[in-house]
Swiss-Prot record:
The name this protein goes by in its record: Adenosylhomocysteinase
Species this chain originates from: Coxiella burnetii (strain RSA 493 / Nine Mile phase I)
Assigned EC number: 3.13.2.1
Primary location group: cytoplasm
Protein encoded by which gene: ahcY
EC main group: hydrolase
Cofactor(s) named in the record: NAD(+)
NCBIfam families xrefs: ahcY, PRK05476.2-3
Record GO terms (molecular function): adenosylhomocysteinase activity
Family statement: Belongs to the adenosylhomocysteinase family.
InterPro entries per the UniProt record, alphabetical: Adenosylhomocyst_ase-like_sf (IPR042172), Adenosylhomocysteinase-like (IPR000043), Ado_hCys_hydrolase_NAD-bd (IPR015878), NAD(P)-bd_dom_sf (IPR036291), S-Ado-L-homoCys_hydrolase_CS (IPR020082)
Length: 438
């Protein structure tokens, strides 16, 4: 594989694992398109107008089959792109190959080193003939931070960034507060059709998929701790309970904790569950959630995994001096001095993309339709967005939902003029206030 990657780097403007996987990738992309009605609707609506003509987008999102559909949508709307993955394990090599074969600059492969990861990001910021980006599309904030810290000279020409995930949004707000954010940002994560669908329904399916693929373990009857009860944690807890697990929740937020209790989950602390649970899932977007001390208490063959964006929720670094036995890709057993074995999935990185293929295409169509709309907003209406962090307006959020409803057989009721007047809305929407909690 190394020789193939070296050859690719020298002869083409891409860096991937294996170009021979392209045909397989193309077949899966075509299947995914049938499950991504939002993106396909945007292609149809804007194919002639080309609202992204002139846009040069540097992207950093998991290089999956679904992301391939996003990339090709951006290009059909007029954009040029250069792309890397936001996680060293999340790339689907056949997806990367399918795009590279079409001449799209992709810098991603499954199993990158940390050094290679940052080199791939750097490759998206510089292209042939002086190519540099004027828009960013990010997931987790690494591309944004790298641009601000390593390439400040690019910032004056960047109209903005659209950010995909909770962790990246936290970083954006911190940068804004510190004064280090030099261009506007659209917080895609907090669009209702992203956070209440991708984060919840996506994780509800992909967590179980990844644990089963990695371990073949029976979920029914297991005691499982889910750390965090935001939208991601809610989806994880629902799926685990549906499979017959006894689910325990850890939380810092009393509102989320009370929600968990009202759903019938036990709200506990890691300290009290570390020595008795069978499976641990972190879903907080925070650091040091499962510590070395917690793992010392865990029983033999306990399974530890993370579905938050970064790999610092579980203190994997503290285990490096122990013996590691690789079972299969992204599945390791850590053997403690007393002989206890702890099963670690994806080295503490995103388990659903490290050990499986991530969220299903349909729910990613929700998220990525928001991304395309955010890119159009930043490109077409820069005067509306001084430096700051924004969310997409409610009418666009509702439009994303509308584009997906028919695909699942849904039909909307139409308000009469009298009904619309009674509740004070336009018959065509938006139907809720900006502060409404879905």
């Amino acid at each position: 594989m190394e020789n193939d990657m070296e050859t690719a780097t020298m002869t083409q403007d891409y860096h991937i694992a294996n170009i021979n996987l392209a045909d397989w990738g193309r077949k899966e992309i075509e299947i995914a398109e049938t499950e991504m009605p939002g993106l396909m609707a945007l292609r149809k609506k804007y194919k002639n107008a080309k609202p992204l003509k002139g846009a040069r987008i540097a992207g950093c999102i998991h290089m999956t089959i679904q992301t391939a559909v996003l990339i090709e949508t951006l290009m059909l709307l007029g954009a040029e792109v250069r792309w890397s993955s936001c996680n060293i394990f999340s790339t689907q090599d056949h997806a990367a190959a399918a795009l590279a074969q079409k001449g799209i600059p992709i810098f991603a492969w499954k199993g990158e080193t940390e050094e290679e990861y940052w080199r791939c990001i750097a490759s998206t910021l510089e292209g042939p003939k002086g190519w540099t980006p004027n828009l960013l599309l990010d997931d987790g904030g690494d591309l944004t931070a790298h641009t601000l810290q390593k390439h400040p000279e690019l910032c004056q020409n960047i109209r903005g960034v659209s950010e995909e995930t909770t962790t990246g949004v936290h970083r954006l707000y911190r940068m804004l507060k510190e004064g280090s954010l030099k261009f506007p940002a659209i917080n895609v994560n907090d669009s209702v059709t992203k956070s209440k669908f991708d984060n919840l329904y996506g994780c509800r399916e992909s967590l179980i998929d990844s644990i089963k693929r990695a371990t073949d373990v029976m979920i029914a009857g297991k005691r499982v701790v889910v750390c965090g009860y935001g939208d991601v944690g809610k989806g994880c807890a629902q799926s685990l309970r549906a499979y017959g697990a006894t689910v325990y929740i850890t939380e810092i937020d009393p509102i989320c904790a009370l929600q968990a209790a009202m759903e019938g989950y036990r709200v506990v602390t890691m300290d009290e569950m570390a020595d008795s649970a069978d499976i641990f899932v972190t879903a907080t977007g925070n650091t040091d959630i499962i510590t070395h001390e917690h793992m010392l208490k865990m029983k033999d063959q306990a399974i530890v995994c993370n579905i938050g964006h970064f790999d610092n929720e579980i203190d994997i670094a503290s285990l490096q001096d122990y013996q590691w036995m690789n079972i299969k890709p992204q599945v390791d057993q850590v053997i403690f001095p007393d002989g206890k074995r702890l099963t670690v999935l994806a080295q503490g990185r995103l388990v659903n993309l490290g050990c499986a293929t991530g969220h299903p295409s349909f729910v990613m169509s929700n998220s990525f339709t928001n991304q395309v709309l955010a890119q159009i907003e930043l490109w077409q209406y820069p005067e509306k967005y001084p430096i700051g962090v924004y969310v997409l307006p409610k009418h666009l959020d509702e439009e994303v939902a509308r584009l997906h409803l028919e695909r699942v057989g849904g039909k909307l009721t139409t308000l009469t003029e009298k009904q619309a007047d009674y509740i004070g809305v336009d018959p065509e929407g938006p139907f809720k206030s900006e502060h409404y909690r879905y």
